[in-house]
């Protein structure tokens, strides 16, 4: 996922009728009708990918409901085994950077330890302000405020590492790799977190679910990549025209 498309999805609700985006220096490049059209084309050609983007970057409830119903239909159509639907929905959580149930206790402890200070959220706000500045957005604009809200929500609800607050580094004077997330900025779930969350044995998972999980995850990323490409191509065409 390119940063430009991620930012576009975060900033603009495709259902909104009053969006206008700005380029660097505040010069208008794309208008609401163009953005809405690009999103509509992505939804038409890669419906799952579109709703995954909305689920990941906008936390759209309706999009997540669509993805969950897609998983149920997928499992029903191919007659997948016990735990399949639950496992694939957790795969969606992993793709959307949400913690799995087996991670919650550890993440909750880290949040309690590192996010209690009144200054704990400053890095998230700084990151949002930097993104707004790089994209020519006024600090007091609606879009900039949306970015700040989403960065704070990511810190509180996603698998963003509470210790480094998503930067991957700790230390005030001499920076070094965060030991909690191994420098990634995310406490990413593993297959073992997935197995523990659905309460199944490793032997059962490898025999009945592993190939399904791998195939579905690949399918999701292909759909997201396809939706992103449609949005990029459409907007590039609008700009060049």
Model regions and ranges:
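Short Cys/His-rich "knuckle" micro-motifs
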Residues: 171-176, 188-192
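The −1 position to Zn-ligating cysteines in a subset of zinc-ribbon hairpins
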Residues: 160-163, 177-180
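N-terminal alpha-helical interaction blocks
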Residues: 1-141
């Amino acid at each position: 996922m390119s940063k430009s498309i991620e930012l576009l999805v975060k900033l603009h609700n495709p259902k909104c009728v009053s969006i206008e985006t700005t380029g660097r220096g505040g010069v208008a490049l794309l208008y609401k009708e163009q953005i809405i059209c690009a999103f509509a084309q992505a939804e038409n050609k890669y419906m799952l990918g579109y709703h995954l983007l909305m689920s990941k970057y906008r936390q759209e409830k309706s999009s997540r409901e669509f993805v969950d119903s897609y998983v149920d239909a997928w499992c029903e159509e191919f007659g997948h085994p016990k735990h399949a639907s639950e496992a694939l929905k957790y795969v969606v959580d992993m793709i959307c950077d949400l913690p799995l149930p087996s991670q919650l206790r550890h993440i909750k402890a880290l949040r309690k330890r590192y996010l209690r200070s009144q200054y704990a959220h400053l890095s998230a706000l700084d990151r949002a302000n930097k993104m707004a500045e790089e994209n020519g957005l006024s600090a007091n604009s609606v879009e900039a405020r949306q970015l700040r809200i989403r960065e704070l929500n990511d810190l509180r609800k996603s698998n963003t590492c509470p210790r480094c607050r998503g930067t991957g580094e700790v230390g005030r004077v001499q920076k070094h790799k965060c030991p909690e997330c191994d420098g990634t900025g995310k406490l990413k779930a593993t297959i073992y977190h997935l197995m523990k969350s659905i309460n199944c044995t490793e032997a059962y998972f490898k025999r009945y679910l592993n190939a399904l999980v791998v195939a579905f995850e690949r399918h999701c990323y292909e759909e997201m990549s396809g939706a992103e490409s449609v949005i990029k191509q459409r907007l590039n065409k609008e700009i060049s025209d």
